[in-house]
């Protein structure tokens, strides 16, 4: 058995659009979106432990280890293996946290997915991609997307994923220095909850500026730095927010144009140039 698996990438995502089409009786919102993998990422390192413990060996500001999706994902996989009669060792997990928390780019969910992928391989537990996705939904609505490992048209509460091809694109992503709690946005009375449903064909015919983010107006009103970043980025591109915020982004026709925009971003914001990915960098470790 291998003893370690290092430099495991957990990529971010952008919501190219995000429509709220309704709300279920249980309070969950019905969504439509295209989730786009991008090459911004966290990096995780896994080492086996002989004592059977799951340990996060690096500190993450504001996130106790017991509440971290990384630890929860590892323990869930260990429990699932035990239920199948498979005894596995423990693991020490170190993370290089590069993605902002509360940014709407899926950092925590992606970290959890990479943990499931890496430990399923390292432990030899043998779960297939669909089985890992079933575990993932117990950790968070976005986790199954990162386990799917491809860009997708997303519907329902996030559980209906249709893989799709998206064009190669350069983006500038800005984090305006605030963390936006998702429940704050979804519980706002003024949130639009009745956007007309669309199809993959609708999206494909009207790239790149299809649709909107129904959460954007609520987040911009509640968190002025989000509004400021959107206003600034709108001067150089088609700015929109990803997820429930706080990150905003714009697409550019070339890397040169993205570089030019990035150079002018005010220094008090974190900003990145990034490009699309066609597949999750860890996808080769997934069993179909």
Where are these regions (language model features)?
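ATP-binding N-lobe of GHMP and related small-molecule kinases
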Residues: 1-102, 121, 125-130, 175-176
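Residue-level signal for inorganic ion chemistry
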Residues: 16, 44-46, 70, 108, ...
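Solvent-exposed alpha-helices and their adjacent loops that cap or buttress functional pockets
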Residues: 36-37, 137-138, 144-147, 163-167, ...
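Short, basic/glycine-rich phosphate-binding loops at helix/coil junctions
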Residues: 50-63, 115, 137, 203-213
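Generic non-transmembrane alpha-helical segments
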Residues: 73-84, 131, 135-138, 229-236, ...
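Glycine/serine-rich anion-binding loops at beta->alpha junctions
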Residues: 94-123, 141, 238-252
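Contiguous, small/hydrophobic- and glycine-enriched helical/loop subdomains that border
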Residues: 112, 116-153
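Conserved, helical-rich catalytic subdomain that frames metal- and/or nucleotide-binding sites
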Residues: 148, 153-238, 253-288
């Amino acid at each position: 058995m291998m003893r370690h698996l290092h430099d495991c990438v957990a990529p971010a995502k952008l919501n190219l659009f995000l429509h709220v089409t309704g709300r279920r009786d249980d309070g969950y919102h019905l969504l439509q979106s295209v989730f786009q993998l991008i090459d911004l990422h966290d990096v995780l390192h896994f080492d086996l432990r002989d004592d059977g413990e799951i340990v996060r060996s690096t500190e993450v500001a504001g996130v106790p280890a017991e509440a971290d999706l990384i630890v929860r994902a590892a323990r869930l996989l260990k429990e699932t293996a035990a239920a199948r009669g498979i005894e596995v060792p423990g693991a020490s997990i170190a993370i290089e946290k590069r993605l902002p928390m509360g940014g709407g780019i899926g950092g925590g969910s992606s970290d959890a997915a990479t943990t499931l992928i890496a430990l399923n391989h390292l432990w030899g537990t043998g779960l297939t991609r669909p089985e890992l996705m079933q575990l993932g939904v117990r950790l968070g609505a976005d986790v199954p997307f990162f386990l799917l490992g491809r860009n997708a048209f997303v519907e329902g509460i996030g559980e209906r994923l249709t893989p799709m091809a998206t064009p190669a694109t350069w983006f500038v992503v800005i984090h305006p220095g605030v963390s936006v709690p998702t429940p704050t946005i979804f519980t706002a009375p003024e949130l639009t909850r009745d956007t007309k449903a669309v199809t993959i064909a609708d999206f494909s015919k009207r790239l790149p500026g299809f649709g909107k983010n129904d959460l954007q107006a609520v987040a911009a009103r509640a968190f002025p730095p989000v509004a400021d970043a959107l206003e600034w980025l709108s001067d150089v591109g088609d700015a929109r927010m990803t997820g429930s915020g706080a990150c905003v982004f714009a697409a550019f026709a070339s890397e040169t144009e993205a570089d030019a925009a990035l150079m002018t971003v005010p220094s008090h914001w974190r900003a990145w140039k990034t490009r699309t990915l066609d597949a999750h960098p860890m996808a080769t470790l997934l069993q179909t």
